[in-house]
Curated annotation (Swiss-Prot):
Protein name as annotated: Large ribosomal subunit protein bL36B
Family: Belongs to the bacterial ribosomal protein bL36 family.
Keyword Ribosomal protein among UniProt keywords: yes
Record-linked Pfam families: Ribosomal_L36
GO cellular component assignments: ribonucleoprotein complex; ribosome
Keyword set includes Ribonucleoprotein: yes
SUPFAM superfamilies per the UniProt record, alphabetical: Ribosomal protein L36
Entry keyword set: Ribonucleoprotein, Ribosomal protein
Family annotation (HAMAP family): Ribosomal_bL36
PANTHER family in the record: 50S RIBOSOMAL PROTEIN L36 2, LARGE RIBOSOMAL SUBUNIT PROTEIN BL36B
Molecular-function GO terms, alphabetical: structural constituent of ribosome
């Protein structure tokens, strides 16, 4: 999982990527290709 300052590019990496907010942090999750996961602190 990458730690990024901006998730816009991470969201556009794959069509299945989606942004989720959990516990005050923003995450990018990708079910079909999990290597595209990212988090913004």
């Amino acid at each position: 999982m990458k730690v990024l300052s901006s998730l816009k590019s991470a969201k556009n990496r794959h069509p299945d990527c989606q942004i989720v907010k959990r516990r005050g942090r923003l995450y990018v999750i990708c079910k079909s290709n999990p290597r595209f996961k990212a988090v913004q602190r």
